[in-house]
Design a protein with these regions (language model features):
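Extended alpha-helical scaffold segments
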Residues: 1-163
């Protein structure tokens, strides 16, 4: 209540309150990143708030948490490549964090994605061709989000990847 009052009247927060607020925001973001499943709406709101803090909240320790979470998500995806929900969740997280100035080092995530891309053509389409196409579209969108050039995601046999 005191912080809201001070902000509403345009007064700056005392340094002790500002530091406390940044710490709580940092921990809230960390908890959202570590939660299963991730509440993306809450995480997005927290990240937007953190972006107004001049980079003091989105620091190296949160970068480490993001990297670890994304690495776990790609490992889960390697184990369950046909589950579109896992692809979409990783893509949604990547969309939120990739533009942030956090110095993310996602080489393991990108390598896992590349490995999955090589396996995607061998996945059986099952009985639902539309679901297989949706999975492929989601997977290619994830690749684009992770920084792969669209042409590098094409296979020599596009029928197999879209099957």
């Amino acid at each position: 209540p005191l912080m809201n009052f001070l902000q509403n009247i345009g007064a700056p927060l005392p340094p002790a309150l500002e530091t406390t607020r940044e710490y709580v925001l940092h921990e809230d973001i960390r908890r959202r990143l570590e939660a299963y499943p991730i509440d993306f709406d809450q995480l997005k709101a927290l990240i937007q708030d953190a972006q107004t803090r001049n980079g003091r909240v989105l620091d190296a320790s949160l970068s480490f948490v993001v990297k670890n979470r994304m690495e776990h998500m790609i490992q889960d995806l390697v184990a369950n490549p046909a589950e579109i929900e896992r692809i979409q969740a990783l893509d949604r997280l990547a969309h939120l964090v990739m533009p942030l100035p956090m110095g993310l080092n996602l080489w393991k995530v990108q390598n896992g994605y590349w490995e999955l891309l090589q396996q995607l053509a061998s996945l059986p389409p099952g009985n639902d061709a539309e679901a297989a196409r949706a999975r492929t579209r989601a997977f290619l969108e994830l690749g684009s989000t992770l920084g792969f050039a669209p042409n590098s995601l094409r296979t020599s046999d596009p029928v197999k990847i879209a099957a």
